From Swiss-Prot:
It comes from the Bacteria. This is Probable malate:quinone oxidoreductase. Belongs to the MQO family. Pathway: Carbohydrate metabolism; tricarboxylic acid cycle; oxaloacetate from (S)-malate (quinone route): step 1/1. It is an enzyme of class 1 (oxidoreductase). The lineage of its organism: Bacteria, Bacillati, Bacillota, Bacilli, Bacillales. SUPFAM superfamilies: FAD/NAD(P)-binding domain. Keywords: FAD, Flavoprotein, Oxidoreductase, Tricarboxylic acid cycle. It catalyses: (S)-malate + a quinone = a quinol + oxaloacetate. It comes from Bacillus thuringiensis (strain Al Hakam).
């Protein structure tokens, strides 16, 4: 056991996509800073960032219907869709910068062009999708989107989904070829390989046990070396907690006022994966449906072509599960351990408010394989039970907090940065859209935690991410130029089309 304090400039907790992104930004902006990373598992990108633990969608609101809501007058609010798309463009630009600068190589190993499609059934839903298409088509970020309710066109676009369909219920789809499939596990590992060449100290099998403030204003991180059993103490001027579902318990240990009155509710995801390669080859798109009435946003069903280990795969889901663990590799005591005197009322209020979610989770947990197959057959009528297995994806901890709009114990479905008033520590909480917006979220961390440096750093940030601080919606020519140049660098252009 060692009580010796080891000093550094920056400590990143968790070797996932968020820490990888923040570390990469900091090494470009402040190369002289010493950075240490602590990860409980044996390698990078093994929890939420792992390719089997998330949907791998480059979330840019091209097909996700929950980002466009219908107003009472029937018009479509696209503001959230535009925001998510703008944020994904920042990620795309940063990845292209890293590839162009030869800091990472072989972009085809982490990003592939893939059509993004929305699919709906029923007259009312068809009308909604058409209105959505018309609203989005006016925005330059969504150029190239097509709409069809013609069965012959749908058969061309979606052969696997349309084959064997007997219902006469009207159907419609939108299709845009500029979507992507992103392997965030592969990208995370690439970024940490790059960071290692920049003398970032990567400590795997090191579990962070506690975080506390020292008398001189630094943060002391207590670390358990799992291999040796030793306890280490490291101090830093700045700490980022990017431990996925494990971030909330660590944030609570800091004792900062901003960590109070926040709770977390874990939801696990399950996907069905096709083991018949002949079926896999018949589908080439990410196809998102519409969540059933009363179901939470996380339940939007989608049938996805994926590229994992350079092999084409086909997944359907998500189905929800319940586990009290905050991480896939966590403890069954995580949920109860996160209940504190300062958040117990917030948690109880959420329990009362979210009876619908509780009921939904119970129903999902009770589903048999055949019941899941019935849901899959709404997408693929001819799906055979023997062709599909279930895989358990990652844990997501949905944030519960008190808000002005929602009142006490309101469940949050986004991604949120919580930071100390002095900017010395920050944590990332929440789930979707998550990894896709990693660059936007980590820029937010920089803005919140290093405000005095932002003027000095702005030039370099704009070199890496040219649309930083600029609305691409209001600058369509810039969007066109950046979309073309980043597509060329990332190897996306030959298969995606963006129309002028």
């Amino acid at each position: 056991m060692s009580n010796m304090q080891q000093k550094t400039d920056v400590i990143l907790i968790g070797a996932g996509i968020m820490s990888a992104t923040l570390g990469s930004l900091l090494k470009e902006l402040a190369p002289e800073w010493e950075i240490k990373v602590f990860e409980k598992l044996a390698s990078a990108g093994e929890e939420s960032s792992n390719e089997w633990n998330n949907a791998g969608t480059g979330h840019s609101a091209l097909c996700e219907l929950n980002y466009t809501s219908e107003k009472s007058d029937g018009s479509i609010d696209i503001s959230k869709a535009v925001k998510v798309n703008e944020q994904f463009q920042l990620s795309r630009q940063f990845w292209a910068y890293l590839v162009k600068s030869k800091l990472i190589r072989n972009p085809q190993d982490f990003i592939m062009p893939l059509p993004h499609m929305s699919l709906v059934q029923g007259e009312k839903n068809v009308e909604f999708l058409k209105n959505r298409f018309e609203a989005l088509s006016k925005n330059p970020l969504f150029q190239g989107m097509e709409f069809s309710d013609a069965p012959e066109t749908l058969k061309k676009w979606l052969p696997l989904i349309m084959e064997g369909r007997t219902s006469n219920e009207p159907m419609a789809a939108t299709k845009i070829d500029s979507g992507t499939d992103v392997n965030f596990g592969a990208l995370t590992r690439m970024l940490f390989d790059y960071l290692q060449t920049k003398n970032v100290e990567l400590n795997y099998k090191h579990s962070v046990e506690n975080i506390k403030r020292t008398k001189n204003g630094l943060w002391e991180v207590k670390v358990h070396d799992i291999n040796s059993g030793k306890i280490e103490h490291h101090t830093a001027k700045f700490v980022f907690i990017g431990g996925g579902g494990g971030s909330l318990p660590l944030l609570q240990k800091t004792g900062i006022p901003e960590s109070k009155h926040i709770g977390g509710f874990p939801v696990s995801g399950l996907f069905m994966v096709c083991k018949n390669q002949k079926v896999v080859e018949q589908h080439h798109a990410k196809v998102y449906g519409k969540a059933k009435v009363g179901a939470p946003p996380m339940s939007v069903p989608h049938l996805d072509t994926r590229y994992i280990d350079n092999k084409k795969a086909l997944l359907f889901g998500p189905f929800a599960g319940f586990s009290p663990k905050f991480l896939k590799t966590g403890s069954n005591l995580d949920l109860i351990g996160s209940v504190k005197p300062n958040n117990v009322l917030t948690m109880l209020a959420a329990g009362v408010k979210e009876m619908g979610l509780t009921k939904y989770l119970i129903q999902q947990v009770m589903l048999s394989h055949e019941k899941r197959m019935e849901e899959l057959r709404e997408f693929i009528p001819n799906a055979k039970s023997e062709d599909w297995d279930i895989v358990v994806a990652g844990q997501r901890v949905q944030v519960i907090k008190d808000t002005d709009a929602g009142g006490k114990g309101t469940l949050q479905f986004g991604t949120e940065v919580v930071s100390a008033a002095d900017g010395s520590i920050a944590a990332l909480l929440g789930a979707s859209p998550g990894a896709s917006t990693a660059v936007h979220v980590m820029l937010e961390v920089l803005e919140k935690c290093f405000p005095s440096r932002m003027v000095e750093w702005e030039g370099k940030i704009k070199e890496m991410i040219p649309s930083y601080g600029i609305s691409l919606t209001e600058n369509p020519r810039l969007f066109q130029d950046l979309h073309t140049s980043t597509g060329r660098t990332l190897g996306l252009n030959e298969k995606e089309t963006v129309h002028n």
